[in-house]
Amino acid sequence: MRRFLTLLAAASAPTLMDGASAPPDTRRHAICILYPDNSTVRGMVSFSQDSITSPTKIACSVRGLNPNGKHGIHIHQFGDLSEGCATAGPHFNPHNKKHGGPFSEERHVGDLGNLTSDPFGSAYLCFADKQVSLYGEHSILGRSVVVHAKEDDLGRTDHPDSKTTGNSGARVACGVIGLSKDFKIVPPFSD
């Protein structure tokens, strides 16, 4: 009997790890530590989702940005940072939508909008998102967060990159999204 239970647990592990069969009331947390990529930008992004059907709380704290500016922030397809942020791939877009803002009707799942930096180059952002999920086949776990050098135009301009990347420029920081024991509160940096 003990051997049967061990085998049953082993067979169930991959399914539970991907979140597809997780109980609906299992709260999940994730964290992404942002590292500079040819810049001084660094920070942390925390995620928390109470259940498969609830929105995901997202809190970002970033420093080293250009002061008093807007900087695009997105979830990208891959967690592969073997060649820096360049190998993170495109925005996470499992539904093949056009680029938009975090509250646009049409958008990539990975479209998180803009960070707005203060005079010291620090930014703090906190909101809830109904498309970002820590569960199932479209989970963001193992993917990456990328901060960009310029403002994301949210798909609202005639620039050729507007509907795909928001014309948000170079990738200045990135990190891989991984499971976390709890929701890390990311206070604003104090310089």
Predicted regions and their residues:
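N-terminal leader/targeting pre-sequences
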Residues: 2-191
